Amino acid sequence: MLYDTSSLMKCQVKKYSGLNFARKIRYVAPDVSSRIWYCGTSIGLTYDGLIASANFCKNRFCPTCQWRRSVKLFRQNYECFEWIKEKYPGCRFVFLTLTVRNVPIDSLSSRLVDMSAAWNRFTQRRDFKCLGLLGWLRVLEITRNSFTGSYHPHFHVVLVVPAGCWLPDHAWWLRCWQLAARDASIMFVNLRVVDGSKSSIEEVSKYVVKDSDFSGSAWVSEFPELYKALSHVRCFSPAGCWRDSRRALGFVDPDKDSLTDDVSTGGKIQDFVYLYNFKMFACIGFH
């Protein structure tokens, strides 16, 4: 097991972060605050430590659910890497980061729409199609600059390159992304070959938004706009052989995942559950 997804202690740490987050937004987004506050208050485990059942809220801003989603994606992406390497011997994985300029919160929603349209134009270009890529995985990440208060949306993409295929240089990718985004001021894209190691898989298994970016309180008044901007955005998008690998391995859409562990192959479920004690800030077992 590459990552420990069953640590009750880790759940408790993330739960504590979730309580702090919920307190901050309780006046600007009471419904979201309530969901995050009561997330993960009941957890059923197997005797070998797997999470068999839990009342996770599945909210993108919930630290507990973001952590669970991230570690499950890590394990799934690792299996996808292995499936693709076996299916297409000699293929390479290239990690591509596509950026845009930072925007204030009131422009974030329109910028995400523009980025989606830019990506479609990018992948429909004739010269892009001529690369003969086997598939890709595109992940959206949004970070917040604590000094300027601006938001930085960007795409992390893993391209699957067939054996013996030549790829253009960095300047070509930058020019194509500038044209697709219709913004000549974009000055940075990142392109590098990855090997399917732990560190490379982590890059495409990140949180959409990091709870560490919301440690202060300056962002609180912006939260309703941020929540609205991300409400109907697809953050995880596989294509080609990557989509095929997820189907073959039986993985579901990350936004629809129950976030519990797969206990269908065995593992006796304990005859008690852990309930969160808000006074002790800990999970206590009850029969």
What are these regions (language model features)?
Residues V157:
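Cys/His-coordinated zinc-finger cores
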Residues M1-Y151, V161-H287:
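Right-hand nucleic-acid polymerase module
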